[in-house]
């Protein structure tokens, strides 16, 4: 019997890439590959790349330089070592990756992961393989389903892609060019995925997409369903304890999604809703197609539906033309909304996007100062949100053993890590925890002990006449 070959995938960026990495593992399992956590002992390394953040391509080339040395060492010992570049940098850079780093065997875009086995075979035969086209077939329909043992090994929370691509064309963003137009999967296929996960121990499902609330997949009634309708359908699946979704666009928040938050107990009250800036002038330059007040009104609709709801967001500082007044508007928005957490980034131009042609660049030192100030405000809000948990009892889905012996870690409805001392048989259960302290960004608490059942009241004693 052939020895299994070892596969290591290093993922950068978004939740979609985490999911895609799992699907690549599933696609290569029938070829005899098993996953390893180290590139050093791998036979195939895949860099699963993201093109959103600063210097994304250069980070990939830096990683490839390290992998080239591993490939040379493997060759000196008579061992085959293969390198593949996947994801959005692969889609954007294409053949340039192989030109700059000839050690690369395969370059594959996000829509072609189901072709990985054939691409590896082609690379072994011809020396290189490149596929960055947008194939006609739905990759989700041809990727093999994950094996039961793989699902169980990945834990009690799982991602399910329901939508991919984006039609919004924000001026700074490469996603429409690297992931293509919006595509939604049929409800029936999503339901099959969810049931398979639940049957193998998953308790929490996160529906993901580049613009997930633009979901419009075909329902059982042959009509397009919204994300709200899909969530309602999945909430009725036995065994689904929690539902989440990410990432959303303010323009696509509709009445059905708001109603789902009002009516579905299993839909977690935590929404990632990027806004990018609090300045209307900058939002217009970003082609966001909404104002800061439009965003505030969307937040208000969510809070009216569920007062317990909390938010995270994304912000870009230093977008071309951003003035001090524009930045102050962003700080004002953050102060008014009050976030449980958020991510902030310095603007960096993405080649091929409209914003890359803008000339009014903000000085790097100003960007640094604004980023520090904004992230400081966000961090203070997150700390206050976490402190408010002390003394309360919250439901926690327990996921795994923690680093400290005897400690189990799970997550609250707001994705806060929560640690308790307990036996590991609570993994996979949602249990109440009383929070008594914080440790950095984690909550520390104790399981609420079940109350003993009260004995029945004795019947009144009666005497005969």
From Swiss-Prot:
* Top EC class for this record: transferase
Question: Where does the TRAM domain lie?
Answer: 387-449
A Gene Ontology term for the protein's cellular component:
cytosol
| Domain MTTase N-terminal, residue spans | 5-125
Q: What does this protein do?
A: Catalyzes the methylthiolation of N6-(dimethylallyl)adenosine (i(6)A), leading to the formation of 2-methylthio-N6-(dimethylallyl)adenosine (ms(2)i(6)A) at position 37 in tRNAs that read codons beginning with uridine.
Supply the name of the protein: tRNA-2-methylthio-N(6)-dimethylallyladenosine synthase
A GO molecular function term, named singly, is: N6-isopentenyladenosine methylthiotransferase activity
Q: What is its main location?
A: cytoplasm
